Amino acid sequence: MDERFVDLRSTKNPKARIKMLSGHFATKNSHVNTYIDMSTVKTRHNNARETARTLAEEYLTNTMVDTIVCLKNTEVIGAFMAETLADSSNMSMSAGNNISVVTPEFDFTGQILFRENSQRMIEGKQVLILTDSMATGTLTMQAIESVLY
């Protein structure tokens, strides 16, 4: 692991942490000056669980969630978020719900689509879209449009 990475811990939950690296990084669509390494949060269950608990706090008492749409390999975080939001022991608006966690597919042009077996989990539901980062917002806007369609 590069020694220049710095641990960034949540003030709400010190167990929820990510690594970041300052510098100049370019993608085909954007330039950023901080790289945030989300790989451990997305793949290690302890990191994902703590991150999900911290993220879910923002939605517990004010947002009903029926479905979580996971973008960019955030399914593990999404599953733990669903568990936290549906937990009947907290004051969640979604307590007791069987929250669906789905991942969209992409066609050959890059359009987001939901197969028939997932559409019933989207249509007429309260949907939370989860992503690991948002440099331009293009993918998130595509996801919003697909959910609303």
Residue ranges and their predicted role:
Residues M1-Y149:
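PRPP-associated nucleotide enzymes
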